[in-house]
Amino acid sequence: MLPGTFFEVLKNEGVVAIATQGEDGPHLVNTWNSYLKVLDGNRIVVPVGGMHKTEANVARDERVLMTLGSRKVAGRNGPGTGFLIRGSAAFRTDGPEFEAIARFKWARAALVITVVSAEQTL
């Protein structure tokens, strides 16, 4: 489901934004492209150090939006491209998803995003 260009973006460092819906409106957190791991072609695993509000939001509403990009990957209109990922999320503290981010010793959990759609934005 995720296109090859998405994987090219992951090879270059950049900021990732993850949006959830909270009781008081949207909530955003950030991480890095290099922290993301893709499993089975449609699950993105993110190591979690904090993200307590994100976790509470996901417990109420599993829908998430994620954006990421890189200036170093050619886009449709020139240098730089990005993606908008829509998906459902869950937090895992054990199992294969958590093991996938074991190199991050500070991670208390894994945020697992099952991709519903991936749209190239640039």
Curated annotation (Swiss-Prot):
Alphabetic keyword roster: Cytoplasm, Electron transport, Flavoprotein, FMN, Transport
Alphabetized InterPro entries for the sequence: Pyridox_Oxase_N, Split_barrel_FMN-bd
Coiled coil: none
Compartment(s) of residence: Cytoplasm
NADP found in the keyword field: no
Main location: cytoplasm
Keyword Magnesium: no
Source organism, top-level taxon: Bacteria
Cofactor dependence: FMN
Signal peptide interval: none
GO cellular component: cytoplasm
One protein family per Pfam: PNPOx_N
Subunit details: Monomer and homodimer.
Its job: Functions as a redox protein with a potential of -325 mV.
Name of the protein: FMN-binding protein
Organism, as annotated: Nitratidesulfovibrio vulgaris (strain DSM 19637 / Miyazaki F)
